[in-house]
Swiss-Prot record:
Its main location: cytoplasm. The gene is rsmC. GO terms for molecular function: 16S rRNA (guanine(1207)-N(2))-methyltransferase activity; nucleic acid binding. Belongs to the methyltransferase superfamily. RsmC family. It catalyses: guanosine(1207) in 16S rRNA + S-adenosyl-L-methionine = N(2)-methylguanosine(1207) in 16S rRNA + S-adenosyl-L-homocysteine + H(+). Keywords: Cytoplasm, Methyltransferase, rRNA processing, S-adenosyl-L-methionine, Transferase. The lineage of its organism: Bacteria, Pseudomonadati, Pseudomonadota, Gammaproteobacteria, Enterobacterales. It holds the Pfam family MTS_N. This is Ribosomal RNA small subunit methyltransferase C.
Length: 342
C-alpha cells in the first residue's frame, strides 16, 4: 500500500481544502492515504481485514474493521471521504450505514474510478446528500455534497438467501456470488466426494457454500472457514447456522490468523482486489499451504484456466493434477509430500 491509487491521487489535488477537516475514510481503501493525509483528524472504517492490517499499523485504534460502522467510528467527524467499490450493492450498504450515523451538514465526498461505476453515487445519494462532480482526472470522478437527510439503515433488510441442493445459503452485499452459485465454485463442488473426513480449511469462504455443501454429505469433517471480508465472515456463520452445521469462522488475510494444520484446504481464490487484478492472495495461498497441511494433506482450488497457477503449484509442491475442467475453469489438486517446499 505504498503507492497511491488513481482515486487517492485525485483527492490529493484538493488536499489544501481538507487541512481543517475531521475525516472518516471508508469504502474501498486500497492504499494508506487515510494514515498520511494532512487534516485535523482522521479515522477509517473498513470491511476488509487486509486493509485494516495495513492501516492499523499507522492509525492504531483510529481504524476499525467490522461489518457495520458504529457511532463511535464517526464521532467528531465533519467529513466523509468514501472510496467507491466495484460492487454497487456494497456501496449502498456501506453508505447508508455510515450516513445514518452522521449528523446533517457534514461534507460527503465520493471518489472512484469511472469503470467502477462511481457515477451511480449521484442517483444513490440524491435524496440524502445531493452530489456535484468537482473533479475528473486519472479516469476517476470526485463528487461532493452535504448531508441533508439521514438515511434509514437496517442490517436485517440487507440479508439475502438462495438454495442449493436443499441447503440455505445466506449472503450480504459485497460477498462473492451473492446472487447464486458461481460456475467455478460449482465445478469445485462437483469434485468433493461424500464421506470426506478430517480437518478442512476453506480459504476465502465467501458465503460458506463450499463448506456447507461438503459438510452436508460428509458429517465427520471439522470445518474452519476464513475470509478477508467482514460480510463474508458473517454470511458464512449464518449459512452454517441456517443448515445446522458447525464450524469455526473468522477473518484472516489468507493464512495470517490461521493456526495449525489441516487434512484438506479448499478455495476459490480471488484474482482481484477491488478494481485491480492481483494474484497475491492465490500465490500466498499456494505457497503458504505447505505450512498448514498435514503429511498427505491435499490442496484443492478452482481457478480461471488462463491464470498461471500450475507453475506455482509445481514450484511449491513438485506436481499438480487437473481433476476437472470446463472451457473457462480448472480444478487443481496437489498433495503435501516430502518434496514440497516447506
Amino acid at each position: 500500500m505504498s503507492a497511491f491509487t488513481p482515486a487517492s491521487e485525485v483527492l490529493l489535488r484538493h488536499s489544501d481544502d481538507f487541512e481543517q477537516s475531521r475525516i472518516l475514510f471508508a469504502g474501498d481503501l486500497q492504499d494508506d492515504l487515510p494514515a498520511r493525509f494532512e487534516c485535523a483528524a482522521s479515522r477509517a472504517h473498513t470491511q476488509q481485514f487486509h486493509h485494516w492490517q495495513v492501516l492499523s499499523r499507522q492509525m492504531g485504534d483510529n481504524v476499525r474493521f467490522s461489518l457495520v460502522a458504529q457511532a463511535s467510528d464517526v464521532a467528531d467527524c465533519d467529513t466523509l471521504i468514501y472510496y467507491w467499490p466495484k460492487n454497487k450493492p456494497e456501496a449502498q450498504f456501506q453508505l447508508m450505514n455510515i450516513l445514518s450515523l452522521m449528523p446533517s451538514g457534514v461534507d460527503v465526498f465520493v471518489v472512484g474510478e469511472n469503470r467502477s461505476g462511481v457515477r451511480s453515487a449521484e442517483p444513490m445519494l440524491a435524496d440524502y446528500a445531493p452530489l456535484n462532480k468537482v473533479d475528473s482526472a486519472r479516469r476517476c470522478g470526485l463528487y461532493h455534497g452535504r448531508l441533508e437527510k439521514q438515511p434509514q439503515f437496517s442490517l436485517e433488510s440487507c440479508w439475502a438467501e438462495y438454495n442449493i441442493d436443499g441447503l440455505t445459503i445466506k449472503t450480504l452485499p459485497g460477498v462473492f456470488s451473492r446472487d447464486g452459485l458461481d460456475v467455478g465454485s460449482q465445478l469445485l463442488l462437483s469434485t468433493l466426494t461424500p464421506h470426506t473426513k478430517g480437518k478442512v480449511l476453506d480459504v476465502g469462504c465467501g458465503a460458506g457454500v463450499l463448506s456447507a455443501a461438503l459438510a452436508s454429505h460428509s458429517p465427520k469433517v471439522r470445518l474452519t472457514l476464513c475470509d478477508v471480508s467482514a460480510p463474508a465472515v458473517e454470511a458464512s456463520r449464518a449459512t452454517l447456522a441456517a443448515n445446522g452445521l458447525e464450524g469455526e469462522v473468522f477473518a484472516s488475510n489468507v493464512f495470517s490468523e490461521v493456526k495449525g494444520r489441516f487434512d484438506m484446504i479448499i478455495s476459490n481464490p480471488p484474482f482481484h482486489d477491488g478494481m485491480q487484478t492481483s494474484l497475491d492472495a492465490a500465490q500466498t495461498l499456494i505457497r503458504g499451504a505447505v505450512r498448514h497441511l498435514n503429511s498427505g494433506g491435499e490442496l484443492r482450488i478452482v481457478a480461471n484456466a488462463f491464470l498461471p497457477y500450475p507453475k506455482i503449484l509445481d514450484e511449491t509442491f513438485g506436481f499438480h493434477e487437473v481433476i476437472a475442467q470446463t472451457g473457462r475453469f480448472k480444478v487443481y489438486r496437489t498433495v503435501m509430500t516430502r518434496q514440497a517446499k516447506k
